[in-house]
């Protein structure tokens, strides 16, 4: 591994493999080489807090804890509309007051959106929060081990297969109350890489996104290799939902959404407050 190689971790989900395919396979001229580790977002959040690797895909929820050492890239992440986490239940109109809810992580953006939704809509609050691996949540709700489950990503397209009902869409609630897109996943890189390297990396990520859009079939082998037996049509839906203009560039609305989420979460005591320049790049 050359000194120029960056160690990166992102998830095996189709949006990440689609975005990074060209970059990971040396098809972006002048870009740094990548040494890729696949890890779920709960793992990468922990890596960020421990200062591991050079570049990570993390939850926006972890940013307030790590931005002293890590810079938020203005591209490569996941924001969008109509793509928020869902709360699923066995019964169509379940009351979640005092009920047990399974979540994939307590340091995820989905969890922040859920807590903000619950603060607005569940008088007295929900009951016990149980953290469990993402793939176990829908079966646990179906089997009555928990009263409700918070799910993300492809579960939007598959929850009916488990006989479950959508109680609420966290993204709809967020969009309705703020008018902003839903911040989900961020790309961060070590500030110690220095401004020139960070800028070069951001340019390379943007080029990788554009390459994937220009020739979607080129990324398909990489996407499907890591898509955990996902139906190709579901993988395409997943990419269509999570890879969008905010992936190429956060822009004004993207930054407003991130700052809005983290400011509101800080006001609820869920995360530390952000400094005024915390989101600046590089």
UniProtKB/Swiss-Prot annotation:
<feature type="active site" description="Proton acceptor">
    <location>
        <position position="153"/>
    </location>
</feature>
<feature type="binding site">
    <location>
        <begin position="109"/>
        <end position="110"/>
    </location>
    <ligand>
        <name>substrate</name>
    </ligand>
</feature>
<dbReference type="InterPro" id="IPR003773">
    <property type="entry name" value="Menaquinone_biosynth"/>
</dbReference>
<keyword id="KW-0474">Menaquinone biosynthesis</keyword>
<comment type="function">
    <text>Catalyzes the conversion of cyclic dehypoxanthine futalosine (cyclic DHFL) into 1,4-dihydroxy-6-naphthoate, a step in the biosynthesis of menaquinone (MK, vitamin K2).</text>
</comment>
<dbReference type="InterPro" id="IPR030869">
    <property type="entry name" value="MqnD"/>
</dbReference>
<dbReference type="Pfam" id="PF02621">
    <property type="entry name" value="VitK2_biosynth"/>
</dbReference>
<dbReference type="GO" id="GO:0016830">
    <property type="term" value="F:carbon-carbon lyase activity"/>
</dbReference>
<feature type="binding site">
    <location>
        <begin position="57"/>
        <end position="59"/>
    </location>
    <ligand>
        <name>substrate</name>
    </ligand>
</feature>
<comment type="pathway">
    <text>Quinol/quinone metabolism; menaquinone biosynthesis.</text>
</comment>
<dbReference type="GO" id="GO:0009234">
    <property type="term" value="P:menaquinone biosynthetic process"/>
</dbReference>
<comment type="similarity">
    <text>Belongs to the MqnA/MqnD family. MqnD subfamily.</text>
</comment>
<keyword id="KW-0456">Lyase</keyword>
<protein>
    <recommendedName>
        <fullName>1,4-dihydroxy-6-naphtoate synthase</fullName>
        <ecNumber>4.1.99.29</ecNumber>
    </recommendedName>
</protein>
């Amino acid at each position: 591994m050359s000194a120029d190689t960056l160690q990166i971790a992102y998830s095996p989900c189709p949006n990440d493999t689609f975005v990074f395919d060209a970059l990971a396979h040396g098809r972006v001229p002048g870009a740094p080489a990548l040494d890729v580790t696949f890890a779920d977002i709960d793992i990468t959040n922990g890596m960020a807090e421990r200062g591991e690797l050079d570049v990570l895909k993390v939850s926006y929820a972890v940013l307030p804890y790590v931005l002293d050492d890590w810079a938020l890239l203005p591209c490569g992440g996941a924001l969008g509309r109509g793509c928020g986490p869902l709360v699923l239940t066995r019964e169509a109109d379940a009351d979640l007051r005092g009920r047990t809810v399974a979540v994939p992580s307590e340091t995820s953006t989905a969890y922040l959106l859920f807590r903000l939704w619950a603060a607005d809509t569940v008088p007295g609050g929900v009951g016990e929060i149980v953290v469990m691996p993402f793939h176990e949540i829908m079966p646990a709700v179906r089997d009555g081990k928990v009263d409700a489950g918070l799910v993300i990503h492809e579960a939007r397209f598959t929850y009916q297969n488990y006989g479950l009902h959508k109680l609420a869409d966290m993204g709809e609630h967020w969009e309705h109350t703020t008018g902003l897109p839903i911040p989900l996943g961020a790309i961060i890189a070590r500030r110690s890489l220095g401004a020139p390297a960070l800028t070069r990396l951001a340019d390379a990520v943007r080029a990788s996104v554009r390459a994937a859009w220009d020739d979607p079939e080129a990324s398909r082998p990489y996407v499907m290799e890591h898509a955990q037996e996902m139906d190709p049509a579901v993988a395409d839906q997943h990419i269509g939902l999570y890879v969008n203009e905010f992936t190429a560039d956060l822009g004004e609305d993207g930054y407003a959404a991130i700052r809005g989420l983290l400011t509101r979460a800080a006001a609820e005591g869920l995360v530390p407050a952000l400094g005024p320049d915390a989101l600046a790049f590089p």
